[in-house]
């Protein structure tokens, strides 16, 4: 699969990596982001397993390569580390705020691309260079894709690259859905927040999320 939306290696994309591991970077996230990421990781793993069981994406090369039982534990890691790029932002910019100025919002929205670069750099032990080198390792690609593409949306309205439809990696689609499920369930005040969250997510089939993937929630 082409690295659609991949961070291009250039002088502008070099970053200073002060972390020695993903876990060290994870610990640099503010508590609420760490807690959210743990929940999203659990939902991602469950959705990943359900997607495999339902043959979601059957016949599509990218799905065949990535949607395999051997990657179930990896799916959890993809959910856990999907916001790792926020470790490269100041704490006050790690949590989205409605009051952000345009400049602050633009800074906040750099975290997915920074996350991919952080993941890739530590994979390659190239912390000093802070650049991404190509890889054909599916597990490595899935982690990079989850970081960079989880805020992309099916209709192309997401960020950072405005990808749409099948341009978005399967694992990123799943992490994005898991994150939205967590957000809705956390905001809904009722006895059955997950049931109501799923009802809301079904309305986004073909808009924010893949219709086929939404069916996994049924």
Task: Report the location of each language-model feature.
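Histidine- and acidic-residue-rich, metal-dependent catalytic cores
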Residues: 3-218
